[in-house]
Amino acid sequence: AAEAGVRVIWKPFLLGPIFSEQGWTDSPFNLYPARGRYLWLDLQRETRRLGIAWRRPARFPFNSTLATKTATWIDTGFRLPAYCRAVFRAGFAERRDPATPTVIEECLRQAGLDRAPLDRALAEGGGERTRADVAAARQRDIFGAPSFVVNGELFWGNERLGAALERAWVD
């Protein structure tokens, strides 16, 4: 996106509440075994193609509530994407649990941040902000991640990033 001159506004949100509204009690990748097997194979292929370190997490999905609540206290500038990448690296490359304050603090440090967002998430909860982000995702008909919204049009899945960028160029 940066190479294409497209500005991205990161909006972390929780998928769990959106899945629950669809009647799912777990990730669809656990509920539907064939879909799950495909996901893990596809993640292996994509991360290899992109040169991203990846190992299947010991537990999936991991609880991302604390990571997401912490994200609500980070400015949407360049540090938020760095923090999100650090959280994903911890969970999907290093097999560390991003539900723990210790791991979140390390992710903040890797993004060049102090632990203030974590402290605010722990003290003030961040629940209202997190619920607002889920509501905003719901309003945009977002049902999975990653999702990209360009001028109100939804693109879902990493393989749709190119189409989303093309749409941004046209508009």
Regions inferred by a protein language model and the residue ranges of each:
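C-terminal cap of thioredoxin/glutaredoxin-like
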Residues: 1-7, 11, 86-171
